[in-house]
Amino acid sequence: MEELRQTKNFTKRDYRLSENKLFYNHSKFGNSNEIDIPFENIEGEKVSHKISNNNTLFFSVLVYIVAIALFISKINNGGDDQSVSLFWAVIATIILAFYWFNRDDFWKIKLTDNNYLYIHKNIPNKEIPENFINSLISKRNEYLKENYLIIDENLDYQSQLSNFKWLKSIGAISKIEFEEKYLELKATVNPRKTDIGFGK
């Protein structure tokens, strides 16, 4: 079973691949939640997604401005003690560091229920998450082909065609694979066949 483990700022994300689903465990400060996502629910579209708290960045800049203003004020008034401006500069730096370490850079993978699966791009490094996502999509495609890219003359034409269209729409099969299966379906199952086991 392939696994990916990611930890950042007390948050742990564990991903495990089985033969027909993805197990995802999210834990933070001892609170844990595990869900399983069937391969049928993974659309597979992957986009880059960054998360940052711009309010924290704005507040840091504001405190830096206060520190600079106090520094200039002390110089203009002939004062030598810059401890107050230095204090605010240190506070601003701490806030900026907090902002920096809480920025997240994810791969966002679309699910069928308008939810998304988030995987850190660079934890533990850039290559491992990429390889895991490739394995996820490869296993998903293999499973979906085995279970939905089949032709059964006892099943109705339209539902089987819908399966092939769905597989093509999520990238589980190529356009060429779809066209080949479509021609095979037309040759095997009567398009007008509506009842299982009976043709007209």
Model-assigned labels for residue ranges:
Residues S27, V47-K50, F98, K121:
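Surface loops and adjacent helix of pleckstrin homology
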